[in-house]
């Protein structure tokens, strides 16, 4: 029981939608954790890998911006949502769009979306057979997975 509790939100299977598109959720909020998720995902049989990433804290996002971009680069489809502030105020002059721009600088495509319902709809409209979708971050991004899975489809 302790092992299961300690593994909560670590590559946790949420469910499927459109028959065979798998959704996973992970608490990762540091570039090394995201790189580990990318490595694990690339070892799974899949078509395209999607990641919805919610950066955790303005300070971490500012300090590790390039590292986050490199860690997210292996994913085929990258969606960045608003920074989860935790207890911080944005005194760092940083936004989620800055991360999208940094990802673009290294030659990858990413999009910024703030509304979770719109993110879920976008993924449902664009994901195809055998894709893998990951929701990643220490904040509220975990709410998106249940919006995607079959028992929550429109």
Annotate each predicted stretch with a short phrase.
Residues 4-74:
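Nucleotide phosphate-binding/pyrophosphate-handling subdomain across enzymes
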Residues 26, 78, 133:
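Hydrophobic, well-ordered secondary-structure elements that form the walls
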Residues 36, 63-65, 91-92, 124, ...:
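Short amphipathic alpha-helical segments
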Residues 51-53, 80, 135:
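Structural beta-sheet core signal
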Residues 55-58, 83-86, 138-141:
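Short glycine-rich anion-binding loops that position phosphate/pyrophosphate groups of nucleotides
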Residues 69-129:
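C-terminal helical cap/extension that packs against the catalytic core
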Residues 118-149, 154:
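A glycine-rich beta-strand to alpha-helix segment
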């Amino acid at each position: 029981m302790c092992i299961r509790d300690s593994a909560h939100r670590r590559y946790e299977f949420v469910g499927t939608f459109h028959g065979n598109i798998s959704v996973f959720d992970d608490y990762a909020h540091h570039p090394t954790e995201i790189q580990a998720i990318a490595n694990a995902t690339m070892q799974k049989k899949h078509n395209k890998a999607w990641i919805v990433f919610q950066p955790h804290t303005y300070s971490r996002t500012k300090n590790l911006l390039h590292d986050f971009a490199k860690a997210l680069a292996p994913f085929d489809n990258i969606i960045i949502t608003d920074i989860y502030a935790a207890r911080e105020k944005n005194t760092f002059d940083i936004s989620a769009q800055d991360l999208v721009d940094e990802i673009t600088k290294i030659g990858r495509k990413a999009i910024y979306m703030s509304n979770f319902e719109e993110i879920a709809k976008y993924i449902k409209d664009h994901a195809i057979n055998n894709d893998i979708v990951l929701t990643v971050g220490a904040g509220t991004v975990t709410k998106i997975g249940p919006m995607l899975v079959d028992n929550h489809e429109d």
